[in-house]
Curated annotation (Swiss-Prot):
It comes from Drosophila melanogaster. It is found in: Nucleus; Cytoplasm. GO terms for cellular component: cytoplasm; nucleus. Interacts with Pde6. Belongs to the PDE6D/unc-119 family. The gene is PrBP. Its main location: nucleus. GO terms for biological process: sensory perception of light stimulus. This is Probable cGMP 3',5'-cyclic phosphodiesterase subunit delta. The keyword Cell wall biogenesis/degradation does not apply. The keyword Cytoplasm applies.
Length: 151
C-alpha cells in the first residue's frame, strides 16, 4: 500500500463512524440485540453481550448505521469470526459507492452454519471475536474487533 493509499485511509477513517448496530431474527424481523456505540475505533477490543437464542436462529439480519465525511468509491468489509484466535468463518460484503457527508444504513443477512458445525454457547462465550475490516476498494479504513459474550 502506497503513502497515497495510507493518507486516503487515514482521511476516511477520521470522518467515519458507526452510529449503531442491530441484529434481528431474519425470519421474524424481531430485534435481538442493539447497541448505539461506535465499534469502528481501531485500537481497542469492544464487547457485545448478545442473547444466547441467536445461536438457534436460521439466519440473522445485521444492520449497520454509519456516517462518513469522505466519499468512498467501493465501500466493503471483510469479516472474520475467530474462536480462540483461529478463523472459523469469513464473509465478504460489498456496498459500493457512498457519498460524502452522508449517514447510511447497510443491512445484510448472515445464515447460520449447519447444526452439526455449531458449538454450545458455554464453549463460545468470551472465546469468539468478530474482526471486521472496513475498506474503500483496497484501502483499509479501520479494523474493529468485538468479543462476544452470550447472555
Amino acid at each position: 500500500m502506497g503513502s497515497d493509499d495510507q493518507s486516503a485511509g487515514d482521511r476516511i477513517q477520521k470522518g467515519f463512524q458507526i452510529n449503531y448496530m442491530i441484529l434481528r431474527d431474519a425470519d421474524s424481523g424481531k430485534i435481538i440485540w442493539q447497541e448505539n456505540k461506535d465499534f469502528s475505533a481501531p485500537d481497542q477490543e469492544h464487547e457485545a453481550r448478545v442473547p444466547v437464542k441467536i445461536l438457534d436462529m436460521r439466519a440473522v439480519s445485521r444492520e449497520i448505521n454509519f456516517s462518513t465525511i469522505e466519499s468512498m468509491e467501493n465501500f466493503r468489509l471483510d469479516q472474520k469470526v475467530l474462536f480462540k484466535g483461529r478463523i472459523m468463518e469469513e464473509w465478504f460484503f460489498e456496498m459500493g459507492f457512498v457519498g460524502a457527508n452522508t449517514t447510511n444504513t447497510w443491512q445484510s443477512t448472515i445464515e447460520a452454519a449447519p447444526e452439526s458445525q455449531m458449538m454450545p454457547a458455554k464453549v463460545l462465550n468470551g472465546n469468539v471475536t468478530i474482526q471486521t475490516s472496513f475498506y474503500d476498494n483496497e484501502t483499509l479504513i479501520t479494523k474493529s474487533v468485538v468479543r462476544l459474550y452470550y447472555i
